[in-house]
């Protein structure tokens, strides 16, 4: 905290100019440099997409439809509201939109840290509905 307003005026600029404050772009660039080294990004995203595909297959087998077809780690699935009530007792999802009086579109998203046993638990829950 700088109490003298005359010193405070250019303080941020002086810190940045003398290397005491890194630019956000540089920090983001370092993250991307690490991700794109030795196929790390492809490796961790492949797991996320594989887990999403496993969910997608189970949802399709259950007869659920999708807001739009995709092959990413995000699934926008249309589910009967009665099923969502049961699913929400054990699992989290993002509400997207109401489709009709009895159905809603929700988003399930997988990531590099998604555990297959958690995906399997969700699949078992859906199969019982």
Predicted segments — roles?
Residues 35-36, 126-129:
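Generic structural signal for hydrophobic core residues of well-folded globular domains
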Residues 53-127:
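Conserved C-terminal alpha-helix-loop-beta "cap" of PLP-dependent enzymes
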Residues 1-74:
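Active-site C-terminal subdomain of aminotransferase-like
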